[in-house]
């Protein structure tokens, strides 16, 4: 695995103690793989920072790269949405991030992401 990009469902599952997500993250970190968290995913998952310990720890881990929806990413997301005929900015941000880095995607909704990032491996959590 060259790296791992997490979607919102994976972060929520992590917060709920999902062992599959925890194991996937542990394997990625042990392999010195990059872990990417798109900011749109963080925005969807973050509700109470004081109580979301697992998410806060993950965001502070040195292996984690927080991926902003900056101008180049925003343009790539918009293009992906236009081509796919879909409208979920967060899913497209995950797909753009993973595709550009050749990452595996951890998701609880593989259908949407498989359509957006057909060349990325998906791990259902």
Task: Place the predicted regions along the sequence by residue.
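Short, well-structured N-terminal submotif of metal-dependent ribonuclease cores
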Residues: 1-37, 46-64, 123
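Hydrophobic side chains within alpha-helical segments
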Residues: 10, 47, 91-96, 115
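Structured helix-beta-strand junction loops
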Residues: 31-32, 61-62, 83, 101, ...
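Phosphate- and divalent-cation-binding pockets in alpha/beta enzyme and binding domains
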Residues: 44, 54, 76, 115-116
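Active-site neighborhoods of divalent-metal-dependent phosphate/nucleic-acid chemistry enzymes
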Residues: 65-110, 123
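Short loop/helix-cap segments at secondary-structure boundaries that form the rim of catalytic
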Residues: 111-119
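Beta-alpha-beta core module
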Residues: 119, 124-125
